[in-house]
């Protein structure tokens, strides 16, 4: 208990020092909506928002109290078994978003980053405790890997986190925990993946097992990659299965998983290696489209399903920025400002969090009717993937350059810009 209290104190102190005047965030009290003049684009704002989203999940699981403390909100038509799987959703999706920060964030020397390093140290401790609690079959918070088909999805997101933090969420884990994690991932193998983006969850699990030094099944990776190459529909977009859907699943799942899987195991087969240039070029193009979809006020088109994933709609844009793979005409600082505006629009409206600090279903506040039957409280934590650029150091241009307008702001105020064009790759 004393160790846990020390970690909690370390995180709270780091927050209060890193962003003075924003210490209320550590108490999980959502502020009112910001005016345009109040919008912050700096790293401390992003850390504040990351903490508001992630800390309730990580803290509860590290104490083996996630099941007893996290609410389970779902739509009226929600599946009855969501209470069994929503906790894995919350943890895996949170971890997938903050993994690059856990791996690399705030590592540079200097007074500007000392508080962030302290914050990160505290987070690493509770994350490792949380992983241990979640993969131990004897734990009251065992995350029920393999219990339902939904656990295939979120074992995939857990795997994505492992791939994004090869040291902190793999090599530096206790050997017992690493073995239990591998067992947990393998427990999802009997589950059938649908012939759509779900194939990438199965493939991501195998890529993570490869990264963990475990036996892995190449056929699951090969099938997922080959099918998605067949499902490419042009101009940077893939179908979700044989058909194209007007939604954000190219960013929620498809392209981030393709990038991570090929980065992990792409060199294991010549056919996979040959896919990398096209997959990277398509990701860059789709990131370009996503940047243009962010309106001058930080809103964006509300189309397709899974809208309560909020800023997760821009996971690929965040991922491409993290990889320094943005198109030449998209400056990193304009992506920072655009994503900051999205964070303000989707995380600051009243009702986004309940009184205890847990996310509620909605896009701009609490809008439970936006939730499809497969969405529950845990699902909402895919919004954490907007925080991927926190894995870049403070000195990186993404963070250090002056604020800049993004494409929609430039165009709607009358700036002259080169017209947009499709790619044929």
Regions inferred by a protein language model and the residue ranges of each:
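N-terminal secretory signal peptides and thylakoid transit peptides that target proteins
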Residues: 1-14
């Amino acid at each position: 208990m004393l160790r846990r209290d020390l970690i909690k104190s370390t995180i709270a102190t780091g927050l209060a020092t890193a962003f003075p005047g924003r210490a209320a965030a550590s108490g999980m009290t959502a502020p009112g909506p910001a005016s345009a003049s109040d919008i912050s684009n700096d790293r401390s704002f992003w850390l504040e928002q990351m903490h508001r989203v992630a800390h309730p999940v990580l803290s509860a699981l590290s104490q083996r109290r996630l099941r007893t403390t996290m609410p389970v909100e779902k739509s009226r038509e929600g599946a009855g078994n969501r209470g069994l799987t929503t906790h894995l959703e919350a943890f895996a999706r949170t971890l997938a978003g903050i993994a690059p920060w856990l791996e690399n964030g705030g590592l540079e020397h200097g007074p500007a980053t000392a508080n962030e390093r302290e914050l990160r140290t505290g987070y690493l401790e509770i994350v490792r405790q949380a992983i241990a609690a979640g993969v131990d079959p004897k734990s009251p918070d065992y995350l029920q890997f393999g219990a339902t088909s939904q656990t295939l999805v979120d074992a995939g997101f857990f795997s994505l986190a492992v791939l994004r933090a090869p040291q902190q969420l793999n090599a530096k884990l206790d050997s017992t925990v690493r073995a239990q994690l591998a067992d947990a991932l393998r427990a999802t193998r009997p589950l059938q993946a649908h012939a759509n983006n779900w194939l990438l969850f199965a493939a991501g699990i195998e890529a993570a097992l490869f990264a963990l030094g475990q036996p892995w099944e190449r056929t699951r990776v090969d099938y997922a990659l080959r099918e998605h190459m067949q499902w490419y529909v042009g101009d940077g977009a893939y179908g979700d299965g044989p058909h194209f859907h007007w939604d954000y699943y190219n960013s929620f799942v498809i392209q981030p998983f393709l990038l991570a899987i090929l980065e992990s195991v792409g060199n294991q087969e010549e056919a996979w290696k040959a896919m990398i240039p096209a997959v990277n070029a398509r990701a860059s193009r789709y990131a370009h489209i996503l940047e243009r979809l962010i309106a001058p006020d930080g809103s964006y088109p509300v189309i397709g399903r899974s809208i309560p994933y909020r800023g997760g709609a821009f996971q690929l844009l965040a991922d491409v920025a993290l990889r320094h793979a943005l198109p030449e005409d998209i400056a990193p600082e304009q992506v920072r400002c655009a994503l900051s505006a999205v964070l303000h629009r989707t995380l600051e409206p009243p009702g986004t969090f309940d009184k205890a600090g847990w996310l509620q279903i909605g896009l701009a506040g609490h809008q439970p009717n936006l939730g499809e039957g497969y969405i529950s409280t845990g699902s909402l934590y895919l919004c954490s993937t907007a925080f991927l650029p926190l894995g870049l150091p403070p000195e990186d241009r993404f963070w250090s350059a002056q604020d800049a307008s993004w494409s929609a702001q430039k165009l709607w105020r009358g700036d002259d810009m080169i017209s947009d064009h499709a790619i044929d790759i």
